[in-house]
Amino acid sequence: MFAVIKTGGKQYRVAADDVITIEKLEGVAGDKIEFTEILMVGVGADATIGAPFVEGAVVSAEVVDQGRAKKVIAFKKRRRQNSKRSRGHRQHQTVVRILDIAAAGGKAKKASKKTEAAAEAAN
């Protein structure tokens, strides 16, 4: 089973036990995270595409590490002016391990219990 998740303004295709590097998320190593912005869920050639997200689909993950990316150098030079400027930047990143992909019904079960309790209270 695979899913396409959206986090940090980017899209990632993930499967169970994948380890991916994404934009920084709050948390320390060992924390559990749930991604709810799921764009697509599928098994093999069979896939469910959301509009824009798949209702009730949840991807569970665990934070493995917090770190920083390789340094990116921004260099500006003005020719014949003996003027140059160099600046470096390192983006913060989070490494996560995908634990489980729950298709439609992963989080909806909790909501359906509330609606059942509300229906019983109304009767």
Curated annotation (Swiss-Prot):
Any GO molecular function: rRNA binding
Assigned keywords, A-Z: Ribonucleoprotein, Ribosomal protein, RNA-binding, rRNA-binding
A single cellular component GO annotation: cytoplasm
Pfam families: Ribosomal_L21p (PF00829)
Segments traversing the membrane: none
InterPro entries from the UniProt entry: bL21-like (IPR028909), bL21-like_sf (IPR036164), Ribosomal_bL21 (IPR001787)
GO biological process: translation
Signal sequence coordinates: none
Similarity comment: family membership: Belongs to the bacterial ribosomal protein bL21 family.
Classification via NCBIfam families: L21
Function summary: This protein binds to 23S rRNA in the presence of protein L20.
Known partners and oligomeric status: Part of the 50S ribosomal subunit. Contacts protein L20.
Annotated protein name in UniProt: Large ribosomal subunit protein bL21
